[in-house]
């Protein structure tokens, strides 16, 4: 079963673009199947209130994993351990 990586983001967020690029690169490198779900917090009032400016925020397999920056080595470890 694939591991879900959920990326909470918003438009015009350079850190979000960097996080997405790191996630996509690592997902291609690991043997574990990965699905990536990108959620724009500005499309939902509840999410906008919850995350505010605190994006990117990344969940791996349902657990909070990264805020602002994604560490490629740590993400790789989390995906392999999931």
Spell out what each predicted region is.
Residues 48:
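Active-site loop of classical SDR/Rossmann-like NAD(P)-dependent oxidoreductases
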Residues 51:
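Surface-exposed interaction regions that form or flank ligand-binding interfaces
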Residues 1-6, 32-33, 77-82:
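Haloarchaeal acidic low-complexity proteome signature biased toward cell-envelope/secretome components but also
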Residues 67-70, 74:
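N-terminal, polar/charged subdomain of small-to-medium soluble alpha/beta proteins
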Residues 1-29:
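Local sequence-structure signature of Cys/Sec-based thiol-disulfide redox active-site neighborhoods
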Residues 55-65:
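A short, hydrophobic beta-strand/beta-hairpin element that forms part of a small beta-sheet core
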Residues 32-45:
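Thiol-based oxidoreductase modules, predominantly thioredoxin-like and allied folds used
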């Amino acid at each position: 079963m694939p591991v879900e990586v959920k990326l909470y983001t918003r438009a015009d967020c350079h850190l979000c673009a960097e996080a997405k690029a790191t996630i996509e690169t690592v997902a291609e490198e690991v043997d574990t199947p990965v699905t990536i779900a990108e959620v724009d917090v500005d499309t939902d009032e509840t999410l906008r209130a919850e995350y505010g400016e605190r994006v990117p925020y990344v969940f791996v397999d349902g657990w909070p994993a990264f805020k602002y920056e994604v560490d490629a080595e740590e993400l790789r470890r989390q995906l392999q351990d999931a």
